Amino acid sequence: AGMQFKEGSVVRTISKGQNVLGKATITEAFEKDFVIYDLNRFLSLHSSLSDPEIVINSDTNNLTIKSGTSKTTYGLADESMIIAPPAKEIKVENAEVNFRLTKDDMNQVLKLSGILGLPNIAVVGDGSEISISALDVKNDESDNFSIKVGETASNFKMIFNTENLKMVPGTYDVSISSKGISHFKHATDQIEYWIATEAGSKYEG
């Protein structure tokens, strides 16, 4: 997937399906806007170099990446070639479901979903507890795994695609709205995600 970098220290990206938006504030600030067409390719290059220094060349629409005595020229893309995130911030207001998801609980549910081959993760309220479960919503007889993460007086089932919850590891404060959008805010780093819930999600109150 491609990624747009804006002038400043805030980086925002959106998934190809436009159902996951990520935002992070980084320590370095970019002097100019630029677009990378294949982010994984660029990150692989960046990680293979020792202490790389990046110079943005707007006139030739490329980057010069210096590392020791080596120099790499890396071509940039046009904004029209990628799916750019919306300029407007997403707000999740009056979210009905709120809880803290610890790093250990998140890691465990993702690990078990992988071992059991389960395509969905659901946040479920049964009128007393909130649990996060790995399951297959299309198969009632599938294996499932769940962990209690909070308490609630409400009944709901908010469904996510497991792939959409593969985020930067950490503890997150989670808010989920019955309108189909959730907000995951990292507890210690300046990282946030907005993730759409899947069809079949319901909030009964």
State the predicted function of each range.
Residues 1-76, 95-205:
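DNA polymerase processivity clamps
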Residues 77-99:
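Long, charge-dense
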